[in-house]
Structure formats: C-alpha cells, structure tokens
C-alpha cells in the first residue's frame, strides 16, 4: 500500500521500482546488442582489410619476383652479349696480329732474299776477280820468263812493279771486303732494328688488347655491383614495409583486445546492476 502511493516526479504517474528495473535492463540489452553489432561490423571490416592487405602483398611480391626475374634475364643477356663481343674483339685482334706477323715474315724473307742475292753477286764478282788476277799473273809470269834472257837488268824493277801492283790490288780487295763487311753489318743492323720495332709493336698491341679486356671485365663487375646494390636496397625497403605492416596489425589486435576488455567490463557492470536490482 505504501508503494502504490508513490508518484513519479517527472511524469506524475505512480512510481514502480520493478518497472524501472525492467526498463533499465532493456536499455542495457539494446545498447549491448548495438555494441555487439558494431563489434561484428568492425571485425568484418578488419577481416576484409586483412584479406585486401594479403592480396596486395601477394601481388606486390609477385611483381617483385617478376621484376627480379626480368632483371636476371637482362643481366644474363648482357653478360652473354659482352662475352660474345669480347670473343669477336679477341678474334679481330688475333687476325690483325696474324696479318702483321705474316707481313713481317714476308718482309724479313724479302730482305733475306735480297741480302742473299747481294752476297751471291759479290761472291761471283770476287771469283771473277780471282780468275782475272790468276790469268794476269800467269800472263805476267810467261812474259817474265820470255823476257828473262834479255831483260835481266829490269827483272828487279818488274818484280818491284808486280809487288807494288799486287799490294795495291790487295789493298783494293781489302777495302772492297771492308766495304762489303760494312754493308753486311748495316743490313744486319737494319734487320735487327726492324725486328725489334716489329716486336715492340706486337708487345704494344698485346698490351692494348689486355687493357681492353681488363676494362671490359671492370665494366662487367661495376654493372653487377650496381645491380646487386639495387636488389639489396629493394629487399631492405620490402622488409621495412613488412615490419611496418606487422606493427600495424599488432596495433589493430591490441585495439580489438582493449575493445573486448571494455565490452566485458560493460557486461559485468550490467550483470552487477541486474543482480543488484
């Protein structure tokens, strides 16, 4: 009877504690249902975002692998092309060396033949000179023997003249031999000089070939180094982005845990209010 006489201060109607408890419980259930719907929607959005991130990461990884494969193929093609170019360059220089060697051999052979011809000609002239001297000596000996009986007084003069003439001829022969020796020495010196020059040219050409091949190897090593540096930088960027994604996922999981903890605490409060009512 005492409870039926209580009046609500807001509506002017009779106030009932049981009715107030029911209304409070219904409002909490509606709020809890609304929170559950929001939680379910948030969970669905998170799952969709995770799926989208997985798809994007898989697509990016596939594009990266394709890019690396194309880069490796282009590197292999470049290495093959440069190797083929080096082979062609080496074959070209070897052909040039072969032509130069053949040309030098031909020139040396021509000089040798010309020198041999000159020596043969000189030998023939010396033999002719010896024949002439021998004939003239025999002739003079015959003349001396023929005139010995009548020209006894002039024998010594004739002998002296012959000795003087012989000396002159021997001096002329010695001078001729000396000139021939000097000519031979000059020809040998020219041959040695030409040979040394050819060998120096061949050595210089070999050094140039070695420098060209060394520069090609250095360029190949530089290209490989730059490519590997770019690949390492790309891998480092990908690892950093992956770490950032993992950190973001951890933050999302932490937020969900906090939200779940708050929801559980709200449910506990509602249950406590319901039990107290």
UniProtKB/Swiss-Prot annotation:
Annotated coiled-coil positions are 70-90
Any one GO CC term of the record: microtubule
* Recorded domain comment: Consists of a small non-helical N-terminal domain and a rod domain with a 29 residue repeat pattern based on four heptads followed by a skip residue. This alpha-helical protein is characterized by the ability to form a special segmented coiled coil and to assemble into striated fibers of 2 nm protofilaments.
Tell me the InterPro entries matching this sequence: SF_assemblin/giardin_b
Q: Which family does it belong to?
A: Belongs to the SF-assemblin family.
**Disulfide bond annotation, renumbered to this chain:** none
Q: How is it modified after translation?
A: The N-terminus is blocked.
What does the UniProt record say this protein does?
Major component of the striated microtubule-associated fibers (SMAFs; system-I-fibers).
**Annotated region Disordered: where?**
1-20
Q: Which domain of life is it from?
A: Eukaryota
Keywords tagged on the record: Coiled coil, Cytoplasm, Cytoskeleton, Microtubule
Q: In which compartments does the protein localize?
A: Cytoplasm, Cytoskeleton
- Give the main location: cytoplasm
Any matching Pfam family: SF-assemblin
* This protein's name: SF-assemblin
Give positions of region: Rod.
28-277
Show the GO MF annotations.
structural constituent of cytoskeleton
**Annotated spans, Nonhelical region:** 1-27
């Amino acid at each position: 009877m005492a409870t039926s006489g209580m009046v609500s201060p807001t509506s002017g109607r009779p106030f009932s504690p049981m009715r107030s408890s029911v209304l409070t419980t219904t409002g909490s259930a509606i709020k809890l249902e609304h929170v559950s719907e929001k939680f379910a929607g948030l969970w669905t959005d998170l799952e969709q975002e995770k799926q989208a991130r997985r798809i994007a990461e898989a697509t990016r990884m596939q594009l990266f692998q394709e890019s690396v494969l194309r880069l490796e193929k282009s590197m292999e093609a470049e290495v093959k092309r440069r190797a083929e170019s080096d082979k062609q360059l080496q074959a070209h220089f070897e052909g040039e060396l072969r032509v130069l060697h053949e040309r030098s051999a031909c020139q040396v052979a021509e000089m040798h033949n010309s020198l041999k011809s000159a020596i043969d000609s000189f030998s023939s002239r010396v033999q002719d000179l010896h024949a002439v001297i021998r004939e003239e000596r025999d002739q003079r000996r015959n003349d001396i023997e023929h005139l010995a009986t009548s020209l006894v007084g002039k024998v010594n003069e004739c002998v002296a003249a012959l000795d003087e003439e012989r000396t002159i001829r021997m001096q002329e022969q010695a001078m001729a031999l000396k000139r021939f020796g000097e000519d031979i020495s000059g020809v040998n010196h020219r041959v040695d000089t030409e040979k040394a020059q050819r060998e120096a040219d061949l050595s210089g050409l070999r050094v140039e070939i070695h420098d060209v091949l060394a520069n090609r190897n250095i360029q190949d090593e530089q290209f490989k180094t730059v490519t590997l540096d770019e690949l390492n930088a790309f891998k480092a960027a990908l690892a950093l982005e992956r770490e950032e994604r993992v950190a973001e996922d951890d933050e999302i999981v932490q937020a969900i845990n906090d939200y779940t903890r708050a929801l559980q605490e709200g449910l506990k409060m509602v249950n406590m209010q319901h039990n107290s009512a």
